[in-house]
Amino acid sequence: MRSDWIFGACAVPDARMRSAALARQEQLTKPPGALGRLEHLAVQLAAWQRTERPGAQRVWIAVYAADHGVAAEGVSAFPQAVTGEMVRNFARGGAAIAVLARELGARLEVVNLGVVNDPGDLPRVRRAWIAPSSANICEQPAMTATQLRDAIAAGADSIAQARSCDTQLFVGGEMGIGNTTSAAALACALLSQFPQAMAGAGTGLDAEGIAHKATVITRALALHADASSPLERLRRLGGFEIAALVGAYIAAAQAGIPVLVDGFITTAAALVATRLNPGVREWLLFGHRSQERGHAALLRALDAEPLLQLDLRLGEASGAAVAIPLLRSACALHNGMATFAEAGVSDA
């Protein structure tokens, strides 16, 4: 599969449905603007879904799992074996996102792109194997061109499946020991930030561990300083699951499926996606602001106002999943409230 599709045109939200939804909001039995951002969310979903009565019931959550070669630099508080162990946990339904997906009635897809501690074939896990791990970004590019293409395509495959199920909302998540280091390196390269400003605790590093992580990122940035395009920076500094998220976000925007972005790593992927294809930005909504140090800078770069700030830093799409009830409330109010005329209530 060629990768030039990522530069193709994105869908355009329906301006007529946006206007119709705005008009309905003005007629509902409440003062104008009294429901705050919930009103805006309903209108935005109406434009995205091309309907006056939007919904957020049919949700597709895809969690991409992959290991990172940079884990060899000691940038995580957990051993690399945890990635494969968590894939098993996803399959068994014991991970946070599995619990949240069940609670929400959402479809959960777990995609194994390559882990060192390979759990093999598991129920409810799609195997899109690329390699046991990306390469160590302090020594060489994270991915070959072929690996990058395959990872991006794996994300697009999720959207093809989601589209066939008439999905109303897509949520991407990730799992991979060392991936906050790769995401921070990508963010530094894209935003011209110092590693000290982007390196965070990740899985629970102390101050000394965070300082070491920043040093590792500095080494990686120096090695790949000649990478100038967003795609080449992704290839050299990213990882399989980050590239899959990029592919999923672009494919979703092209298919006209709204995306709810999770935390630090997924927002780094969203930034790459928008740099590759600016039309993607119009299809992104941001679930929460993570406790991870660099997330605020990424959100600012995307002019994003997240829905929640709960000091989360788990990943897995968990923060975005927690925000889904807000979207459902926005739609329920928009669709279910009476208008002034229907209720026989005097308008202002």
Swiss-Prot record:
GO terms for molecular function: nicotinate-nucleotide-dimethylbenzimidazole phosphoribosyltransferase activity. Keywords: Cobalamin biosynthesis, Glycosyltransferase, Transferase. Its EC number is 2.4.2.21. Pathway: Nucleoside biosynthesis; alpha-ribazole biosynthesis; alpha-ribazole from 5,6-dimethylbenzimidazole: step 1/2. The active site is at E316 (proton acceptor). The keyword Transferase applies. It comes from the Bacteria. It is an enzyme of class 2 (transferase). SUPFAM superfamilies: Nicotinate mononucleotide:5,6-dimethylbenzimidazole phosphoribosyltransferase (CobT). GO terms for biological process: cobalamin biosynthetic process. HAMAP family: CobT. PANTHER family: NICOTINATE-NUCLEOTIDE--DIMETHYLBENZIMIDAZOLE PHOSPHORIBOSYLTRANSFERASE (PTHR43463:SF1). Belongs to the CobT family. This is Nicotinate-nucleotide--dimethylbenzimidazole phosphoribosyltransferase. It comes from Xanthomonas axonopodis pv. citri (strain 306). The lineage of its organism: Bacteria, Pseudomonadati, Pseudomonadota, Gammaproteobacteria, Lysobacterales. The gene is cobT.
